[in-house]
């Protein structure tokens, strides 16, 4: 196996192991070569779950649940089928991610309108799925190796972007939470200010009442100031 392919597989395995994630595979044109490449790495059982080799269309339908109408209209070598293969493998396996490979290794395209060397790689998780296409020119063996390399690179690229999206979503959620917290603080502060203002008004009114009725110790002896008239005069 080419050293660059081995390096790509090792890089992917480290990423999976570091994050405690597992992967499952669904292969067509590579016939298990991707699974072989990944399980050549010692300790693969920690992150490699299982693999499906669905070479025939019937196998794609039976094993992975690929839509027969999609196969008929789009062809086995298409983005739609690549995504459905990955999603089907994910449903069948207790894994976090799935990689699928479907293409035309050659030497002929067997009547397909797509040229030899065309490949689609599907990547799926529980929350997202994507597919990428490329074309590799070479012998059947070279194409299969190239497909494996492209699948590994695509997986890393998609998962890096997914990680970036996850970070952005977390940052957005944190920002929204901070905005909500500040809003609640402002509302609470405003409510306290209004309450204090109300208490101030009530205190002022009570003070006026005290002044109106307070005698300040100088009691008025009204009876002494009244001239009483004798009714008998």
PLM feature segments, named:
Residues 1-233:
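Short alpha-helical segments enriched in small residues
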């Amino acid at each position: 196996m080419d050293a660059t392919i081995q390096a790509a597989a090792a890089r992917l395995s480290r990423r999976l192991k570091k994050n405690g994630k597992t992967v499952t595979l669904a292969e067509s044109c590579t016939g298990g070569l991707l699974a072989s490449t990944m399980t050549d790495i010692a300790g693969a059982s920690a992150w490699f779950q299982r693999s499906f080799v669905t070479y025939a269309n019937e196998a794609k339908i039976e094993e992975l649940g690929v839509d027969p109408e999609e196969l008929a209209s789009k062809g086995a070598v298409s983005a739609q089928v690549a995504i459905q293969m990955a999603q089907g493998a994910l449903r069948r396996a207790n894994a976090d991610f799935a990689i699928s490979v479907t293409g035309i290794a050659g030497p002929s395209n067997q009547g397909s309108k797509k040229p030899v060397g065309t490949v689609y790689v599907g990547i799926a998780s529980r929350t997202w799925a994507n597919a990428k296409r490329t074309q590799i020119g070479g012998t059947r063996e070279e194409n299969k190796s190239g497909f494996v390399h492209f699948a590994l690179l695509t997986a890393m690229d998609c998962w890096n972007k997914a990680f970036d999206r996850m970070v952005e979503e977390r940052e957005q959620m944190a920002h929204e939470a901070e905005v909500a917290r500040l809003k609640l603080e402002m509302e609470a502060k405003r409510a306290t200010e209004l309450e204090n203002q109300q208490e101030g008004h009530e205190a002022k009114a009570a003070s006026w009442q005290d002044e109106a009725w307070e005698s300040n110790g100088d009691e008025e002896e009204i009876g002494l100031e009244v001239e009483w008239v004798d009714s008998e005069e």
